[in-house]
């Protein structure tokens, strides 16, 4: 299989799509030049259809522009876009104590209380990655940056943003046993469950802000989340990762307890591969690759192609009406995991599946007429919603996926 893939040509395809079509779309269409922050509810052509602002997506867009600045090239327009989004978040995104709201109106007034732990995690990586960009800018001779029309020392701003990232991360870790806190809708004494999504995200967050953390603190955070992902939520008897367990770590026969989310599991595996590389643990990388392949095989729709959104570990009906839809992020994250697995292990199964998922993803999610990609397809692979952004889809999974796959393909070619 490796003999028939032109890695150089494929890397150029991903690079061009990212830099020529996707990033210009968000740079030009999403920035709110009047009130700050970003519009994410963008129709097929980039026109704004709703002006509310969701903290998940605000933080993710800050992170994305910062990551591009740090890993592709230090373009001023990317840094400026990240800073203006971060300043909107710093001013309006939390309650004054870094409890991050879920949603704001266009001007920054809170709409939804800070119940959602992932608002905190995405704020963490946003301010963490931007602090790294600003520190780099300061070292590169850009001693000052423009913030709301004022000139501010880049080093000072980097320090302030790093502090926000670290303090927010501390709050996240303090909430792992009860993520929603006082905003939980569960009845006291109700069925006690824990979910896969938080330890999964923490695997990524820990590496994103690694340079800001004390080594011992970082190591404990990594050890804890790796244990949860690989030893608790991964069930060898199923060969799969489950989305929720009882607090005691046992399987529970209820809707939440039977739920499988192949995309989540597959995405988590490239986080684990990164940690395995960082820790020098090839056996961890190999285990992550095996789980990734098992999840792709299990989640693949053998009739219509693509990966199911939700599944049930006992084959029972799901209550989510969207269970059989094909979503953009699932497929982008799968591409990252598969090509990273091939890069790190040389396992040809990863390359075979990568080609298959690549073909499906590019032929179904990419809009040939307008930039950015569709997010939501029905089971048959037809476009359900022509939007390019909304309450859950923003400047994140498509550009992050394109960036990662481009860089990995380039590295494979160069090696």
Sequence positions of predicted segments:
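Glycan-recognition and catalytic cores of secretory/periplasmic carbohydrate-active enzymes
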Residues: 1-415
